[in-house]
């Protein structure tokens, strides 16, 4: 499989709902998940290429010839672009971390959500007790609340708050894509370009979540040490640890083996169906609990496209085909 990186620059506010409570409208995360991205790409494929374009994308995902990661942050510095990975879910059990690290650094370590690719090996060695790791701040933007108004013909406008995220000028998000053929990557690149015009996440009708594709890079064509590391680790299915890059869930028949020796946290995935043809009334998708990106397993699983609504005019799927990064002890 060939892997590519697509780097996105957001032009304004974005709303990436948490999907884990009734208050998700009032706050925002700093990134979006692969299932959100896949749904948005499906809508774009349908708009651009009709039902055949949609079916092509669904088939590629279903047979595993197209893989998507969650979005992850990047930060441009004087030395180039730094890419980040989700912090692995591993137990900090070594005496080196507990005794030799200042209390302030220990607290900062616990709060970390992202690890720079450049120092990922150092971080992993610190978990194994082989070295110390000094955490660095990982802010890529700021939360910003905005007041919107719900307007109807029968009542006065009702104000409500929307949580939003604004990226710093030198920051954004990137996505890793795995494809078997170049034509698949070209197709996805077209969808990303068009999707950026309408936006991703919530409240796109009022302009949230719009982005531009800043760069598309094939990992095997790059001499950037970060991307060389990613290329090798993505292909390393035999490594003793597998870092999950896609918030997803194994199939029932994969569950027992996957969860053995895994360390993870669960995240709730829900939401309403964004389709004018599925049902005349708003319809909620089936709620599922996924392994959050950053989970560490001892083997890879295949996942699936899960059917999350069955009573409408067409099937509705939730993406759950994982991408893993092989990590050596």
List each model region and its residues.
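Conserved active-site/ligand-binding neighborhood in enzyme cores
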Residues: 1-329
């Amino acid at each position: 499989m060939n892997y590519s990186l697509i780097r996105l620059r957001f032009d304004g506010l974005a709303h990436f709902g948490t999907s884990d409570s009734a208050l998700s409208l009032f706050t925002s995360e700093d990134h979006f998940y692969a299932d959100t991205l896949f749904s948005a790409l499906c809508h774009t494929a349908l708009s651009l290429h009709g039902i055949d374009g949609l079916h092509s994308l669904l088939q590629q995902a279903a047979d595993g010839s197209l893989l998507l990661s969650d979005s992850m942050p990047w930060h441009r510095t004087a030395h180039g672009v730094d890419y980040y990975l989700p912090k692995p879910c591993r137990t900090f059990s070594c005496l080196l971390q507990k005794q030799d690290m200042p209390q302030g650094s220990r607290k900062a370590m616990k709060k970390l959500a992202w690890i720079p690719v450049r120092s990922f090996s150092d971080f992993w060695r610190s978990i194994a007790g082989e070295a110390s790791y000094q955490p660095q701040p990982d802010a890529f933007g700021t939360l910003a609340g905005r007041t919107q108004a719900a307007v109807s013909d029968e009542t006065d406008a009702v104000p409500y708050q929307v949580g939003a995220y604004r990226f710093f000028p030198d920051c954004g998000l990137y996505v890793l894509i795995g494809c078997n053929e170049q034509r698949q990557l070209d197709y996805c690149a077209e969808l990303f370009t068009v999707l950026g015009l309408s936006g991703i996440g919530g409240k796109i009708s009022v302009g949230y979540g719009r982005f531009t594709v800043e760069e598309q890079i094939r990992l095997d064509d790059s001499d950037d040490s970060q991307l060389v590391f990613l290329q090798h680790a993505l292909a390393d299915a035999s490594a003793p640890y597998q870092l999950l890059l896609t918030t997803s869930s194994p199939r029932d028949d994969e569950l027992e083996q996957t969860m053995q020796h895994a360390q993870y946290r669960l995240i709730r995935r829900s939401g309403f169906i964004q389709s004018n043809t599925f049902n005349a009334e708003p319809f909620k998708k089936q709620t599922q609990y996924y392994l959050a990106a950053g989970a560490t397993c001892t083997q890879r699983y295949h996942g699936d496209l899960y059917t999350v609504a069955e009573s409408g005019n067409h099937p509705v799927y939730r993406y759950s085909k994982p991408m893993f990064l092989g990590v050596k002890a």
